[in-house]
Amino acid sequence: AGLFDPLARGKDPFPGQHAYSHVIALSSGASAYLTLGDPKYRDALANAFKLLTTTQQFASGGWGPNETFITPHRGELYDSLATTVDHFETPCGSYAATKLARYLIRTSADPHLTAQYGDNLERVLYNTILAVKSPDSNGDYPYYSTYSPIAEKVYYPKKWPCCSGTLVQTVADYPLNLYFRSPTGLHVNLYASSQITWKQGSSTITLIQNTNYPAEDTITFTLHPDSLINFTLTLRIPAWAAAAASVTINGKPVIKAAPGTLATLRRRWQQGDTVTLTIPQDFRLEPIDDRHPETVALMRGPLQYVALNPTQALDKEPLPLPGSLKHIAPQVFAENYSGRQIIFVPLYQVQNETYTTYFTRA
């Protein structure tokens, strides 16, 4: 009652609370909604998601510096960049965040909210759990993500911490994030080369997804139903898309889908039908909080880009980002500022290098 009742009334119970334990507890509310049908729990989850993503969240999708929720509108996320290196309890937090997003997608009837939940799940995956320092066989495990002015990925000082368990659970859940079935068809939530086979009525259908996303903008789906069948295929169109996404079927344009919604394709599908989705990506800036709009993260598509091996702290130096960043290698961009070259790469590509996550907008 201390969590779900205030959330259902639109209140914010999070400030000062332990971050992970409260987010993972939200999944019990999802189970209550699915079992009892009480809309209180559905409303509570929707409000919790809104609060987490608009008042607590770093650009990576992480939250809870020092494992504690901040008080919104006081600039505390910004302050934490200088006061701690423990910005997100990553394996546990990503496990809780992705589990919550899956429940919300399952129970959403609003295509815009469905897309929003999928967008954030994708953000969390790429920039937190997939961006940790790789564990080793000796029990050295990542625990916290660090977003300090000059940051470094390190292991937790003790072997086999609690997060070593949730890291494995999160990895095991990767396939659960890709596709969602419904009585009318299939929803594609994430874009990664994969294959799914399912029963739709009396037909068996296989969908094969091929892509180099997010390094590239295009995703291809090939369908293999064992008989002609009508069903609906929906594709998430991220809100960050630089323009409308284009969809072709068997090479013929069929729809331009607006960012932040779903592309809905209902037709009579046959063996070998091919769907091609192109999602335009471009750089954008995201402020750390509402008190510090000049302190920004550099984003492209679902990915947070960081400055690699900075020779000095860049957080206070005004930079004209995104400016005219030059593409010098796959997912690697560069620009010259004040006579020196700065390299920008996705946070998930960093292992042993130092990096900067937030910059001052020029």
Task: Give the residues covered by each predicted segment.
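Long, well-ordered core segments of solenoidal/helical folds
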Residues: 1-9, 44-61, 123-134
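Structural helix-adjacent loops and short alpha-helical linkers that scaffold large soluble proteins
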Residues: 33-46, 53, 104-119, 227
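Carbohydrate-binding/catalytic loop surfaces
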Residues: 3-28, 62-90, 137-161
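Conserved nucleotide-binding/hydrolysis modules and their immediate coupling elements
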Residues: 263
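Beta-strand-rich binding/interaction modules
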Residues: 228-249
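Well-ordered alpha-helical segments within folded domains of soluble proteins
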Residues: 17-34, 86-105, 164-174
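C-terminal beta-rich recognition modules with glycine/proline-rich loops and embedded aromatic residues
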Residues: 45, 118-224, 249, 258, ...
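Extracellular Ig-like/FN3 beta-sandwich strand-entry sites
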Residues: 230, 272-274
